[in-house]
Amino acid sequence: MAPSKWDDEEDSSSPPPPPVVARRKFDDEEEEDVLDSWDAAEDSEVEREKAAKAAAAAAKAEAEAAAKKKSKAQRIEEHKQERKKQAEANESDEDSDEDEAARRARLRRTEKEGDLKHAQDLFDDIDLNRNRGAPKAIVISDSADPTQAVDLSAMPLFKPTTKDQFTRLTTTLIPLLTAHSKKPHYALWAQEFTKQLVKELNSGDVKKIASALTTISNEKMREERAADKGNKKTKAAKTKVSLVASRDNKIDATPYDDDGLDDDDFM
């Protein structure tokens, strides 16, 4: 009997390959691999941080170098643009009912304040307050009662602008100051006071004031010389009168009894 077809197929089929047994990793070997991967990740993170810091430092250095190369006009323009953006940002937060005129006034005021602050930052060696002519507050307080104080700079008398106002200031101060002219330190004080008064004037105005003082000095010298001559004449006249008076009032004490004549000579 011929073998069945099924038997032939079974005989012709090859046996399956043996299973591949994977090598088992030890516990410590697996942990070492994990640690190595962590260390590598940490190293890469540190490198990235270092690279980011280096890039930031380089960008900052470039920005500083570029800023140094910019002129003052460019820096002022940049500040203006920044202030304009800030003002526009603040404008969005303001009340929507603000009218156009008020908004423009506020923007102009903000720009002026910013310009002044920036000018003070750039030219801090210039006394802007003095150039504006704003007087400093001069507060005089009572030593007995410190709460009683007066700001002289706020009084209209000390803020003259016209010729009449300056004349009024002069007529007010002169009597108060010249009342101390007989005191020992008045002359020295007047010299220093005059220097301080003309300190802010130009040389031409100072020369005119010096010429006026020279004229006053010459007039004083003539008055003093005339007074000295008058005193000398008066003194000489008094001396002459006293001599004549003393001569007239002299008593004649000559004895006339002993004249060498006897009474018999007349008989």
Curated annotation (Swiss-Prot):
Disordered as annotated region, ranges: 1-128, 220-241
Gene Ontology process terms (BP): formation of cytoplasmic translation initiation complex
UniProt keyword annotations, A-Z: Coiled coil, Cytoplasm, Initiation factor, Protein biosynthesis
Annotated GO MF terms: translation initiation factor activity
GO CC aspect terms: eukaryotic 43S preinitiation complex; eukaryotic 48S preinitiation complex; eukaryotic translation initiation factor 3 complex
Composition bias, Basic and acidic residues: 74-88, 108-121, 220-231
Compositionally biased tracts (Acidic residues): 28-46, 90-100
Domain of life assignment: Eukaryota
Pfam families: eIF3_subunit (PF08597)
Location within or outside the cell: Cytoplasm
Sections of the chain in a coiled coil: 44-96
Family: Belongs to the eIF-3 subunit J family.
Subunit structure: Component of the eukaryotic translation initiation factor 3 (eIF-3) complex.
PANTHER family, per database record: EUKARYOTIC TRANSLATION INITIATION FACTOR 3 SUBUNIT J
Function in brief: Component of the eukaryotic translation initiation factor 3 (eIF-3) complex, which is involved in protein synthesis of a specialized repertoire of mRNAs and, together with other initiation factors, stimulates binding of mRNA and methionyl-tRNAi to the 40S ribosome. The eIF-3 complex specifically targets and initiates translation of a subset of mRNAs involved in cell proliferation.
Protein name, as recorded: Eukaryotic translation initiation factor 3 subunit J
Source organism phylogeny: Eukaryota, Fungi, Dikarya, Ascomycota, Pezizomycotina
